[in-house]
């Protein structure tokens, strides 16, 4: 089961450099509750951004897969994968795709569930989520707060 989780504004903005363009505590809690201790897939830039945020503390995930084109890359606390298509096609267990933009784009064709936090308003940044063909998914859950509409889409 391949799950993708992200927050985006109404223009599909998801990032500003290596940062999230907003700080919404409830959304961070939601993300942590879904991904803590889970097997995750992320890109190399996202990995280094999170390592910078957590500093000497370990990342709050179970097994960490990092997608990279660098075949020489070795990471102490993660498994490096160089062929994301083969990895996603063959992966059979629960997996959470947690970013960034390129990894989301490459993972979307394989995703069974989309956990999307729609952040209200427009923000400034430079990283966008690709277009989604929502006809391939059913909206099965949503909850709205003042700042965010949380949704779950499941593949038809």
For each of these PLM feature ranges, what is it?
Residues 1-156:
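Enzymes that bind and transform nitrogen-containing heteroaromatic metabolites
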